[in-house]
Amino acid sequence: MAIDEERPPGPRLALRGISKRFGAAQALAGVDLEVYPAEVVALVGDNGAGKSTLVKIIAGIFPPDIGEMRFAGEEIRLRGPKDASAFGIATVYQDLALCDNLDVVSNLFLGKEEVRFPRLMDEEAMERHALEVLATLNVSLPSVRVPIAALSGGQRQSVAVARAILGSAQLVLMDEPTAALGVAQTKQVLELIVRLREQGLSVVVISHNLADVFQVADRIVVLRLGQLAGNLWTRETTREEVVARITGADEGKVKAAE
């Protein structure tokens, strides 16, 4: 079955011919990518395949050397992460960038504190909004006033995601969201990704864990040596085929991205 047969009209994010070079190293070469509303796309590939570079371009950290980027049908040029955030692109990095000594509310609103006259932080409003966004994700915490250091890995990941979508996020980028997590915590994070999709958000997940990928992703996009090596419906492919695309074992299909 062709992938286009079940896609809704118009991708939320569309990249065309994205290339990026760092000195003599060609990180990306002519990569196309589309992500639709209410879709989870897994970005997989070996180390050095270009996954992180592609996500950093989407997040506004790096500008592409060549290529076009469209969001909701509009061509955009991102001059930095603030531009990406303004378009509704949120990023959850592998290190989460949380402050262990601050509580959940303070982490959620760090740098974007809600204030009331005369320029005083509105602690009650922030706590109320924190509880609301965590409830939409079905995240259970002992309290929103406990320090981040007191939370489990899965709970910390949930707080990082809640912070990312606080506001008007439409696309969430997640870098290795289940890395170094135990079984129960991994299950919690995967359920969180599914809930993001159910709420209509688009999610791009970088992962080396194919078991997690096959559990939550609608599509799997494979990069190899900076080039697109596969664009596969999860339900219609196998781990063996994905690994073959990642490693180049099936060279006849490496350039035949569906």
Question: What do the PLM-derived regions correspond to, one by one?
Answer:
Residues 2-258:
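Glycine-rich phosphate-binding loops of nucleotide-dependent enzymes
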